C-alpha cells in the first residue's frame, strides 16, 4: 500500500494473515487510524493475498477460484462501506461500491430453473416446510451458539426437512450438508433470512463484476 500523507504517532501495525479481514483492517488503519501505509506490515505465508478470495491463473495453466461470495443489499453494510473507500482500478474517480451497484443494475439475477427434475423445470417456489420444520428453525436461530456446541444440522431437524425444496435450494446455494455444523447453519440463516421468500428465484443475490480476487482484493492491494 502506498504511503498515506496522514500519519499519527503509532510506529507500526502488524496484521497476521492476508485475507479480506486483514486487508479491511489495513484500509481502516489508513483511513481512520491515520497510519501510513508503509507502516502497516501484513504477515502472510502464501505468495498471494486474499485468503479464500485468491482466484487466479492463466489460459495456459487454467483458472482456480475457491467459490464466490453472494451479497445481499439488506446486509453486508460493513463490506459495502469498505467498497466505498476503494477507488476502481479502471476508473479511479469511481469506487468499488459504484461499480458493484452499476453491475448489479445491468445484470439482475432471476432464476427460471432453480430446480430440475427428470429433465424438466421443477416447481421451486413452495419451500415445502412443515410447522415442525419452522419450530426447529426458530429454535436453532434462537439458541446461543454454546448450546449448539458441536452438533450437526441433522441433529436439529427431521428427515423430512432434508427432502424439502428449501433444503435443496439452501444447500446448493451455500454448499451445506446435513452433517455440517449447526452453528455455521445458524450464522448463515441469520445473515440470509431475508432471502427465504426469494430462494426460488435468487432475485436478492448480488455479485461483483469479476471474480472476487480481481474485483475486491487487487483494488485494495493497489491502494
Functional labels for PLM-detected ranges:
Residues 70-76, 202-222:
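Short beta-strand to alpha-helix junction loop
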Amino acid at each position: 500500500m502506498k504511503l498515506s500523507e496522514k500519519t499519527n504517532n503509532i510506529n507500526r501495525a502488524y496484521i497476521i494473515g492476508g485475507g479480506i479481514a486483514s486487508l479491511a483492517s489495513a484500509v481502516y488503519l489508513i483511513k481512520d487510524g491515520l497510519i501510513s501505509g508503509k507502516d502497516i506490515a501484513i504477515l502472510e505465508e502464501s505468495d498471494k493475498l486474499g485468503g479464500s478470495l485468491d482466484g487466479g491463473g492463466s489460459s495456459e495453466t487454467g483458472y482456480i477460484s475457491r467459490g464466490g461470495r453472494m451479497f445481499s443489499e439488506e446486509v453486508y453494510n460493513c463490506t459495502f462501506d469498505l467498497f466505498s473507500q476503494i477507488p476502481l482500478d479502471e476508473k479511479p474517480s469511481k469506487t468499488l461500491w459504484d461499480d458493484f451497484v452499476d453491475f448489479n443494475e445491468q445484470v439482475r439475477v432471476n432464476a427460471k430453473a432453480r430446480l430440475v427434475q427428470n429433465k424438466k423445470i421443477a416447481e421451486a417456489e413452495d419451500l415445502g416446510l412443515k410447522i415442525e420444520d419452522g419450530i426447529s428453525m426458530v429454535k436453532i436461530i434462537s439458541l446461543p451458539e454454546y448450546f449448539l456446541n458441536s452438533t450437526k444440522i441433522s441433529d436439529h431437524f427431521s428427515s423430512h426437512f432434508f427432502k424439502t425444496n428449501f433444503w435443496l435450494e439452501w444447500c446448493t446455494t451455500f454448499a451445506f450438508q446435513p452433517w455440517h455444523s449447526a452453528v455455521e447453519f445458524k450464522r448463515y440463516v441469520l445473515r440470509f433470512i431475508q432471502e427465504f421468500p426469494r430462494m426460488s428465484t435468487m432475485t436478492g443475490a448480488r455479485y461483483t463484476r469479476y471474480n472476487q480476487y480481481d474485483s475486491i482484493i487487487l483494488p485494495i492491494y493497489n491502494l
